[in-house]
Amino acid sequence: MIQESARETPIFHEADICVLGGSCTGVFAAVRAARLGARVVIVEKQNAFGGVATSGLVNIWHSMKSTDFKRQIIAGLTMETVERLKRIDGVVEQKEKGETPGHFILNTEELKIELDGLIQEAKVKAYLHTMFVAPYVRNGELEAVIVENKSGRGAIKAKMFVDATGDGDLCDRLGLEQRTSSLYQPSTTTAKVDRWDEAIKNHHLGELFLQHKEEFNLPEGFGWGSHIPGTKSVYMYAGTRVYHANSADGEQLTFAEMEGRRQVRGVMDLLRKYADGEKMSLVSLPSYIGTRETRHINCKYQLTNEDVLYGRRFDDAI
């Protein structure tokens, strides 16, 4: 243990609502609150908004309809963003049944710019490259959060805070009751690959993996992905699986990032050797791994299986 010196922390900003985490969820919460008249600030540790969709390269928005495909259950700012992307040919719509949307395939680089626009148009104060460090609690009330960025260490004061960090970082630092799974869902490192379709068009990907995964030390699982709108032959592939890693733990997250990238290389080596991947090339990797599960915060209301399966509506939906 070391003892840090006492210090005074400057206030970077004050608002009605502070949103920690600039995923699409965080952005939509911030924009909606601002449109309703609140003064809002949003804090994101990456260089862009959009979370797993942008920094994680996951370019599919799915489950737009109820399980019987009769009712659209996701709309609002999600669909507004889709319409913005349509204007620049940054999205492809895939209908599953009927005429309501099934899922959307996005160019997530274009999505970054559209989310910037939503934030700016709503006059939300934004901090990118800014890391949440600690809560500031006085007299039992959360008054501010401590953050750090290139300007140094500072505080953001607000009347209300939204934890959109994905891992419940604010709730965890506040010591709120939480639970964890005995077996985490695996994390996935995606990849943008050029000439992917050409590499596998004469092969069955699943059979190749079953036959040769041990040679490249690849885990069991399944792969999926899609072509990137606006490109000629770039494909987003999501088929790696990092098991038994808690991405809310610093050391385990580091392992997961490195192992996920190793698996991407293994997949490409497999296809170069046993398929037609000689001309295939790696275009980009995500700035962080796609995490499916870490902490579960015990909230006032907990979603049930029925809520999800039947698309239950809530009066306070964003």
What is each residue range found by the language model?
Residues 1-17:
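Extreme N-terminal leader/targeting segments of oxidoreductases
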Residues 6, 32, 38-39, 44-134, ...:
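Conserved N-terminal/central alpha/beta ligand/cofactor-binding core
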Residues 13-15, 151-160:
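Core beta-strand elements of the Rossmann-like FAD/NAD(P) dinucleotide-binding domain
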Residues 17-41:
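N-terminal Rossmann-like FAD-binding beta1-loop-alpha1 element of flavoenzymes
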Residues 20, 156-166:
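Short hydrophobic core segments
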Residues 90-106, 121, 173, 180-318:
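Mobile, glycine/GP-rich and aromatic-enriched active-site lid/loop segments adjacent to catalytic centers
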Residues 136-155:
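Conserved beta-strand-loop-beta-strand element in the redox core of flavoprotein oxidoreductases
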Residues 163-176:
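Flavin (primarily FAD) binding-site architecture
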